[in-house]
Each structure stands twice: as C-alpha cells, then as structure tokens.
Amino acid sequence: MQNPRTVSDTKRAFYAAHTRPIHSIYRRFIEELLVEIHLLRVNVDFRYSPLFALGVVTAFDQFMEGYQPEGDRDRIFHALCVAEEMNPQQLKEDAASWQQYQGRPLSQILDELNSGQPSAPLNSLNHTGKYSRLHAVGLYAFLQELAGEVTIHLNETLDQLAPVIPLPIEKVKRDLELYRSNLDKINQARSLMKELVEQERKRRAQQTSAPPAVDASSDAPA
C-alpha cells in the first residue's frame, strides 16, 4: 500500500516544477495555499467540485494580481496544480463555468436552489464533503457576479442562503472576514512596493540626467 503524500512532498513537487524565485510577499501566500489544498485533498471527506475550483482560482488570481514577470504567474499556477495532482485546465474551466450566472438576481438563484434541482455548477453549492475556506472564497466570487450589490450586505445575503445550502454559514462569514482582511493587507503591501520601485526609478533617472559636478579647483589660477 502506497503511503499518502506529505506536505513536504507537495512542497518539493512544487519547487521542482517551478524553479524560478518567487517574490517574498507572494511566496508566503503560495506556500500557505499549497498546505491548505494538500490537507484538504488528503481528507477522506474531500469532494472536488466547481465551487472548490472557483475558490482556488479566485484566491490565486486575487493574491497574485500584478505579479511580475506576468508569464511567471501562469507557470506558478501550473506548478501548484501539478504539485497537488490537479488538472489546471479543468480548474480554470470549472471556475469559468460560473460566469453563466453573471447579472442574475439573487432571488432567481434562491428559487433555483429551492427547486431541489439546480443546474450545474450551481448544484455544487449543495456541498456535503469536507468544508474549507476555499469553498467560502468560491461562494463569495460567485455572489460578486450577481445583479445588485449583494456582497455589500454580505452577512444578510449569506443568511438568505443558509436555509437552502448545507455550507456552515457562520464559518463562511468568519472565513470571508479574514480573507478580505488579508487581501486588503497584501494590496497595501503591493501599493507600497510599487511606490518604492517608482521612487527608485526616479532617483536613478535623476542621477543619470544630472550634469557632472565641476571641480572648482581646476579653475583656480596656477
């Protein structure tokens, strides 16, 4: 019987697939995501679903926004999926399938869920496997696409969903509060990093364009 993969195995697989260095503010997020997905997938109650896929893709895209060089971002996502033994194309396709609900009112979604036969991928909100923060992120990303501003009063929206989906809504609320707080922090760190890079660029430009200093001693009479 083959021993289950460990967190260390998953990390090694990732760094074997992506050998280029990763900027420090992003590396911590990637390693935390690697661990989170690994621990979820080795759980016997884990069930892959389009909701999980949307959560993974959304979390990655939002936290890795602005990563340079841009081409490395896709390579990092591919390496992450390889390390977790997931199909990156399937994740992206399943995440994109939620776009069919863009602009729909929440009331219509509630009606479909109440019907007992929601269409795919909406039916993955009837999640009965192991819950994780990534399911909450996927739900939040889905709600952001609906008509109106249902995420402004997020807790009220989640309370409306509570009777018709089996997700642990109170955990979802706490996880999303922490998720949005962490996203704000990394956005602030990104902004600061951009400012520092721009300041350094201007400083170097000024040094390059400045005229050479004149040695006053050379003009002194002999």
UniProtKB/Swiss-Prot annotation:
Region Disordered, annotated ranges: 197-222
Coiled coil among keywords: yes
Keyword terms of this UniProt record: Coiled coil
Transmembrane segments: none
Biased composition, class Low complexity, residue ranges: 209-222
InterPro entries xrefs: Thf1
Coiled coil: 169-208
GO cellular component: plasma membrane-derived thylakoid photosystem II
Family annotation (HAMAP family): Thf1
Function noted in UniProt: May be involved in photosynthetic membrane biogenesis.
Entry's family note: Belongs to the THF1 family.
Name this protein carries in UniProt: Protein Thf1
Organism annotation: Thermosynechococcus vestitus (strain NIES-2133 / IAM M-273 / BP-1)
Source taxonomy: Bacteria, Bacillati, Cyanobacteriota, Cyanophyceae, Acaryochloridales
